[in-house]
Amino acid sequence: MAYLLTFGIIAALCLASISLYRYGNIPRQHILVTLSVLTAWCFSFLIVFTIPLDVTSTLYRQCLAEHKLALDAAGNASTTANITPPPECQEPWGMVPESVFPNLWRIIYWSSQFLTWLIMPLMQSYLKAGDFTIKGKLKSALIENAIYYGSYLFICGVLLIYIAVKGVPLDWQKLKAIASSASNTWGLFLLILLLGYALVEVPRSLWNNAKPGFTLQYAYFKAAKLSTDKAEAEEHVDDILESLQCISRVVPNNHELRPCVETIMRKVPIELQERASRNFSRTGGSGMGATSSTILPSEKALVRIHKQVIKSLQTLQRTEALWSVQVDTVLHLEDVARNIHSAERRFKSEFPRQRTQLERIFYSATLQWYWECLLKAPFLKTLCVVTATMSAMVVWSEVTFFSRDPVLSIFANVIYLAKESYDFFTIEVFSMMVLCYFFYCTYSTILRIRFLNLYYLAPHHQTNEHSLIFSGMLLCRLTPPMCLNFLGLIHMDSHIIPERMMETYYTRIMGHMDVIGIISNGFNIYFPMCMLAFCLSTWFSLGSRALNALGFQQFLQNETIATELVQEGKDLIAREKRRRQRAEEAMARRRDFNRPDPTVASNDYMNKYRSGAGALAGSRTPADGLLRDGDGSFDYAAVASSSALGVPRSLSEEINDRFGVSTQMQVGFRGTSELDPDYEAENERRIVGPPPRGLFDDV
């Protein structure tokens, strides 16, 4: 009967694995980072998938208790044997023994708390440290976290002193309740911020995505901003690498700090090193490192520049990847705008990519036209109406879930109606739908959060390890209060509605939707008001307007800056299209020139036998032998060679003959595979092997 729980565990593991594969770069990141983030994401998803089973299990236990009381009351009221007993309770789907959920929640709770408060912060600080030994990295990580957690301990000490002054007796259970309340307080207020934004932004983004014109304008705007970010990242990398070039020239090869310099240099790609060397030679070292060009750096200076190199290279790699993805998005939207009025009803792309056999069968050009140009917009508008209705229900229930009599929460009323008929299937499906919407709103906001440009989850394997760990910490800290909030909405938190229903196993282990006693007075008033205030501010785009006023450009219609950035994005995309067209033409010419012509070889073969019989032995001209018709043997390689035939060689062949094939240029774009699939496949074959060292790569 535990098949639903097994299915939930498998679904959580699959979803976490797919998400980690999409955002992370598993072959290149350390195994400890992969396992920690996978565990954090899997446990967070598992909580969401398992809560409905705990709810139905609790309702079933309450049904058994009520059934027993009804039987006892019927037996006491009459001694006759003809009294009809009350209907028996039916077990819900996926019923498990009573000991399963308490043990499961304990494992998830303590593992998540251990990861989010101890392991992952230390791992994050370890990755950011610029030291060159394990001991140095651990020391820097411990110092950074000691400062971070020291502030928490100071606040906890103040709270304990306050409680002691109030005369409240303290024991282990009291301290555990205080810690749980503090964690819930932090999580609930962060949840207010995320849900207040997402409950409005999710339906609005679906509606805007149904408008091709708006989507294309916004894509141009994002392209302009990404181009600026990419230029700033490149400039920052050049400045840091110029300082690194100064240090590399100053530190001699036999110096004790030379291995540290080599460790930093190994982090920098070869092309960036060559560009930095050219810039250094051109400027004569007059950049950032010129003032200390004759002074040997200290180990602390090398640690500092090592940390800067790691951070700047990660930012550059992420901005380049996002720029490539954004260019592909804009080109696709332009293709949609171009094909929307097509009479052929076949989707044609300006830069077609290689399609697999399955794509050509199940997603042909005709099907793609019907989806992109005809069906996608109505589908997104329908989803917008559904999500807007769900958002309105969530906001209303958040505002009214503290009302015990009458019950005003929509979600609580649905659970009560299903409970009266013991319709556990409806309860499970409804709970899963609501939790999945909570899950999508909260986690989609986390995935798109851009905290001071340090942590950002970029798809297509472009997310660094720091951002993955940060997202795992947020999920572990937000999931318990999010589920407690849901249990409060359906009136199954005994600390909010004590007389309604039995307590779930989840609230027994995870705690209740309580807050610190100092701020608990009036919580049922300002909690809904904060939720409503954030929703209204998102509806009127107050946050975007404030950021725009502070100089952080936001996409606001009828704004001069936004219009200028849209036009700049159009120009950048037009330039990128011309560059891709030139690259495709150059590759096509190169492939055509290097492809041997079978007609030339056959003509040379026939001329050899035609001229061999009638040629005079004594009449030789300077041109004789150019076609190698004097030999008895036939050299196919020589015949097929363009140089043997007297055809002028190209510049690339001349360079290859003089300096070797390794000097030839490959024209292409990072992140695109449609230009030359053979070249991309060769690159993939070349980089296959053991992944580079990650966490302990400096040791």
Curated annotation (Swiss-Prot):
Q: Where is this region: Disordered?
A: 669-699
Which of this chain's residues carry glycans? Answer: 76
* Keywords per UniProt: Coiled coil, Glycoprotein, Membrane, Transmembrane, Transmembrane helix
Annotated coiled-coil positions are: 564-592
Cellular location(s): Membrane
User: Which family would the database say this protein is a member of?
Assistant: Belongs to the LIMR family.
* The protein, known as: LMBR1 domain-containing protein 2 homolog
Record the organism: Drosophila pseudoobscura pseudoobscura (Fruit fly)
